Amino acid sequence: YQMFDEKNDFNLASFREHIQSVLTEQDSIVILFNAPAHNPTGYTPSDETWDEIIRVLKECAVSGKKITFFLDIAYIDFAGDSDKARQFLPKFGHMPDNILTVVGFSASKGFTFYGLRTGAMLCITQNPEIAAEFKRVASFSSRASWSNTARAGQAAIAKVFRDPQLLQKVFEERKEYEDLLSRRCRAFKEAAEEAGLTTCPFNAGFFVTIPLSTKNSKKTEFSPSLSAEEFELRSPLSVKPHAVWFRRKSLRR
């Protein structure tokens, strides 16, 4: 479906149309939805938009049809205030039985060790029988597909949560990167507006998307108003690999 409409808002009409189109041909659909801090746009739905998305799902889940809504929250820990970024999740706790919400979580990103590729998958449902079935199916399919996540990542997460002081240290370190990304986000927005550069709506995370348009294609150069020194907030040697990558992208013209 088309993600944004002509007003640069989430395109609910296209979202609904494509779900209904698929469900006229078959009885079930799996929807993959990456938010908040969507990759690659950095878009986060507003509270009202989440309500509208849920309303569309319920409207489309007519009798005899099943919807699995896979919510990829990989970048939720870099989507602004941690508590506010999670406030939308309870909205999915009141779905009918024919709508199953599955949440994919990335410990690798949330705990700043990308290379270990550690994550988890859980479901949100009011029905204990559906939850039990999900656990059985997920356990069987994961063992048959990739067996398990990296042991080193699992061990690291377990160690962090056994030690309150270490956990607090991790949160503080991650907060530094959150603040770093937030400042870069604001700087890029200001520079883009100054240069007349159109972007897809974004407000958090690692990414921004510049759509191909007549307006943007006429731009021959985009020069951020901030200097390299203002972006250089710490030595590259002391920054995690993903932060170094973002720094390089931020300074590229």
Locate each region found by the language model:
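PLP-dependent class I/II
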Residues: 1-253
